[in-house]
């Protein structure tokens, strides 16, 4: 709203959930509304980012909200540096700088300045992929595992690491120790299921995380259906810059 501090804007929406989680931890049961309806809770949010907020705040003796914003800015800068390094290795520095610019100006890059988990997650993803390019499979696996504990989309990184490891193993010139690549790629795959299993054990249902997520935010795995619905609706009836530019960005990525 008008008159609110910029700090409040950087701590809006999901950011407030992360700060709350860093301060109070996870609940031990489902949370319900006054009429008995299931509510969303901090259990919907993966632990990587809030745990780091809590640890850094304890060491630096700063409040959790300030720590959350500072970490997001640091990881946002790391995203730019790591993307530049990875793209330079894959193509050249000119393309790398263009990619960094594209990422930084796309509509939702605003989350790189907010207390969101996206900056940390993307930095871990890029670090893992860069480690793969350098055949540093231990680091790739560790960064991949950490990414899986940061956001559920870590599952997509896990798939990429498995494919890369299989291709690496198929080349005999990489030596007998090349099979370790598969082992570390598998370790990277554990981040997401470990947290989902922990939530299930805590609440007594294997699908507990999905229930909390659906109750609080109405989101489920739909194999990309909502993305295409967003693009279609934005192009047909959207009149806002975020909606239209977001749809155009998705279409540009698809074309590339």
Regions found by a protein language model. Give the residues of each.
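Transmembrane-helix motifs of polytopic, lipid-linked glycan transferases
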Residues: 54-55, 67-90, 255-256
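Short acidic/glycine- and proline-prone juxtamembrane loop motifs at membrane-interface regions
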Residues: 114-120
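Membrane-lumen/periplasm interface segments of specific transmembrane helices
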Residues: 1, 10, 158-171, 175-256
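Membrane-interface transmembrane helices that cradle and orient dolichyl/undecaprenyl
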Residues: 91-93, 128-139, 169-172
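Membrane-interface alpha helices of multi-pass inner-membrane proteins
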Residues: 104, 125-130, 138-165, 187-190
